[in-house]
Amino acid sequence: MAKVDLFNQNGEKVGDLQLADSVFGVEVNTYAMHQVVKALLANKRQGTQSAKTRAEVSGGGIKPWRQKGTGRARQGSIRAPQWIHGGIVFAPKPRDYRMSIPKSMKKVAIKSALTSKVNENLMVVVDEIKLETPKTKEVVKMLNAFNAKKTLIITNNAEENVYKSARNIEGVQIIPVNNINVYDVLKYDKVIITKDAVSKIEEVYA
């Protein structure tokens, strides 16, 4: 089992923590991570874009001028794509971009993403993150203690005071462990996670 340092929210080491190899020490599967991220982004797309082709634009049923003798280029319809207000070539139509990913691949992907952060020393485990009142400067102080800028903070529960304190910090996102996903883990340079959240992840994904 991999051993990592356990810190308090002030950046002071308070002990060690053993991480389950079945979650934080797996072989990194880049293909699974790519597929899951691609599906997450695709599923966010609305797919409502639409434009009219020349067959759908109104008007243009009559030839604008005779074929020969005018000195102008021949034209068949004022709704051809080269005309203003003409139809669109290969016009986009509403479509469903959703992709389905097997649960087993999602598991492999999240474990691979977490393992990659551990391997690169980009995951910091803290015993807890507690704030009596919402104070952004306290979260900034914690981030500075770990030299963290673009950071994902994962807690076991949605701590309201911590959430309110972190939500306005640029480049920082805080999520409860139940909402963990591959995209967020990979998107942020560093992950700060509580000890309880680690236990929850091991319970679900081991």
Swiss-Prot record:
Q: Which GO terms describe its biological process?
A: translation
Entry's SUPFAM superfamilies?
Ribosomal protein L4
Gene Ontology CC annotation, any one: ribonucleoprotein complex
Q: Which InterPro entries match?
A: Ribosomal_uL4, Ribosomal_uL4-like, Ribosomal_uL4_dom_sf
- GO MF term (any one): rRNA binding
Q: Which residues form the signal peptide?
A: none
Q: Does the keyword Repeat apply?
A: no
Q: Does the keyword Membrane apply?
A: no
Which residue intervals make up region (Disordered)?
48-75
Please report a single Pfam family linked to this protein.
Ribosomal_L4
For this UniProt record, give its keywords in alphabetical order, as a comma-separated list.
Answer: Ribonucleoprotein, Ribosomal protein, RNA-binding, rRNA-binding
The protein's matches in PANTHER family, at most eight in alphabetical order, are given as: 50S RIBOSOMAL PROTEIN L4, LARGE RIBOSOMAL SUBUNIT PROTEIN UL4M
Assembly, in brief, is: Part of the 50S ribosomal subunit.
- Stated role: One of the primary rRNA binding proteins, this protein initially binds near the 5'-end of the 23S rRNA. It is important during the early stages of 50S assembly. It makes multiple contacts with different domains of the 23S rRNA in the assembled 50S subunit and ribosome. Forms part of the polypeptide exit tunnel.
Alphabetical list of HAMAP family matching this protein: Ribosomal_uL4_B (MF_01328_B)
Say which family it is in.
Answer: Belongs to the universal ribosomal protein uL4 family.
Q: What is this protein called?
A: Large ribosomal subunit protein uL4
Name of the gene: rplD
